[in-house]
Amino acid sequence: MESNDSGGVAAKHGFLFQDCVAAYHVTRMLRDKTIRSVRCEVTDDIDIVSDGYIDFVQVKSTGKTRWNISDIVQNSKGADKKTIPCSSILHKSMQCESDLSLGRRYSIVTEEKVNKTLEYLTISPNARLDKPGRQELIDDLNKRTDNFLTDSGISVSDWIDAATWEVFSSLRELELLGIKNIRLASQDLHGVILSSETVAEDIWCRILDTVTRKGEHSRRIHSADDKSYLRPDLLEWFKQRVEDDQSRSGRKIYVKRDLPHILTPFRAPMASVCAKRKGQVLHQQYSLKKYRYKHIADNVCQWLDEVFLRPKEMSDIHKLTFIEKRERLKNSVFKSLHDVSEFLGRVLLHATIRQHHESQPIPCMLYVEKAGAEKILENVHIVRRDPEGDQLWIGFSELVTDINIAVRLPEIRDQLYEDISDCIDTARKKILDIKDDNYLLRHDIDEILDGSQPFDAHLDRFTFVLFVGYDSNLLTEPETPGFEDDLEKETAVLFEKFAADLIEDSPFANLCIHVFIYPAPSLERLTQLVDEKVREVV
């Protein structure tokens, strides 16, 4: 009996090749937030659902030396060896239907290369302008298919313009590309390097197993979602795999530093007249009728390295001796201790954003180019979103002690509006220059920092954050029980005053602004304790 790979061996290889292509696209989905899901055997062999379109993928793994134009228009034959009309690769691909709201793209994936007749399809659609071969290919295919047109009006020329041909020469090539995506996704999404190649290979095998099982589900019994790998499910599962690897390898994930909450939310967020204005009261509690000043001062010190050291300084700090660490931190912190109130506000705002949004801070102190050097912000954070574009949170703080908070809060708001109007473009450029992507998780904020685009083009991706502390007569030393309801009313009135300009049809109504209000018994006492504690620690 002749030994060859026809029949069952070839069929099994073909199914495995198709599943590896699907698994590869799932690993792409880890790093590409525009991909929403990868469907297995729903419409075509693989359907890649992205923002605005579906890419219908046909996978072929025959033992051809080279693919030519006749191969994609050759109709299949049925059980009686009669030709089945419109059953060729081209016909099937053209007839794939997407939702009315989504466009169509088409892909053919093979192990073998194409000859000159199909070479045009291997060119990236973005690079096809002025490339020869398009019209010749259209004319030839129209001739071979009698100017075939689908029921939904898709012509051969439509298909050509939306189609690409990809070649993966082996299963191993797909596996290596998928494993590369897995390792990069671990760094991009979670800021860590997987402990070994074995871990990445295991994740690949699990993804491959999942797409195989989804592809096997019956179309008659199961829904399209049952046969789809959805991005939210993938991200949640992948995060758990990375965290499991980190816990086994004993390494701490930097981006999830176990730092303490200095202040906590007081009741629910405040009601707002506008979705673009959000308010939250922060507080610290009493213990044995004494306000927890010491708790705040102690925990402020836990955040000093992250607030006052540059990313490279933090990454290198494990190499230093204890004395060197203290000296480096001391030099950075003492530069800011000349104004303890400003120092404290900066740390409290930083810790609040980090704890509540798992943000990535960009250490900087930006000054606007006005008359003199006036600081407009001290906290800049990237808040990642998925699948939406990442946001940039820009903020500053003020601890109000020498003026009525009800008077000062609207003034702070008006000053913010003025600074945004005059200086946001300068600030965007400086943030772009300052941030060091070597120490940040993968993000897409560069596009909103691009000065060639107006600030207004990305309003929904900027959030301005105000942290305002003040002395409240309702918080006494020692504690007067039962103050909570009155404190809620007092802070609600303050927030209403802050947002009152929106009722007057403010031109800044579309700015997204978060206000954190922090009432305390005595900010003067708190800043004094913080000053003493910080000098003691560093």
Curated annotation (Swiss-Prot):
Additional facts recorded: Part of prophage CP4-57.
Q: Which organism is it from?
A: Escherichia coli (strain K12)
- Protein's GO biological process: defense response to virus
Protein name, UniProt field: Anti-bacteriophage protein A
Please indicate which superkingdom the organism of origin belongs to.
Bacteria
Its lineage opens with: Bacteria, Pseudomonadati, Pseudomonadota, Gammaproteobacteria, Enterobacterales
Its biological purpose: Part of an antiviral system composed of AbpA and AbpB; when both are expressed from a plasmid they confer resistance to phages T2, T4, T7 and lambda but not RB32 or RB69. Resistance is temperature dependent, it can be seen at 30 degrees Celsius but not at 37 or 42 degrees Celsius. The system impairs phage but not bacterial DNA synthesis (shown for T4, T7 and lambda). Partially suppressed by mutations in T4 gene 41, a replicative helicase.
User: What Gene Ontology molecular function terms does this protein carry?
Assistant: nuclease activity
Disruption outcome: About 20% increase in T4 progeny; the phenotype is the same in a double abpA-abpB deletion.
Keyword Membrane (UniProt) = no
Keywords for this protein: Antiviral defense
According to the UniProt entry, where is the signal peptide? Answer: none
Please give the InterPro entries that the UniProt record associates with this protein: AbpA_HamA_C, Cap4-like_endonuclease_dom
> Assembly and partners?
Interacts with AbpB.
